[in-house]
Amino acid sequence: MLVLDSGAISRLSERSQAAVAMILALRDEGLWPPLVPSVVLVECLEGHGGRDAAENRFLKTCDIAESVTEALARRAAFLRRRARRGSAVDALVVASAEPGGTVLTSDPRDLAALAAHAVRVRVEQI
């Protein structure tokens, strides 16, 4: 399973040659569509249709996890406590990738710290 954070969404929604090539490679590997926890939208959108157009177009190709269960929230809280860093959204992204998933991000520092306490979660920089 592939989970995207806000940085990955911003980069992949650019429609650059590199972004298109990465999406095609992920599709070929069976990792598309990715999962995007709905709370990530708070970080990658501005709430303005015009400025959010590229991201909104891109998000139509993703699976949006629209709810955060109590179990997922508690797992994210545990990861955040163990890592001693990262935002609540970052912790939910990593918890959503458990077990055995990959998180794609533009800034791996906090996510890697959280993933160090998760069950077989890899963090890859875009």
Positions of the model-derived regions?
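Phosphate- and divalent-cation-binding pockets in alpha/beta enzyme and binding domains
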Residues: 43-44, 75, 113-114
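Acidic, metal-associated active-site segment
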Residues: 44, 87-102
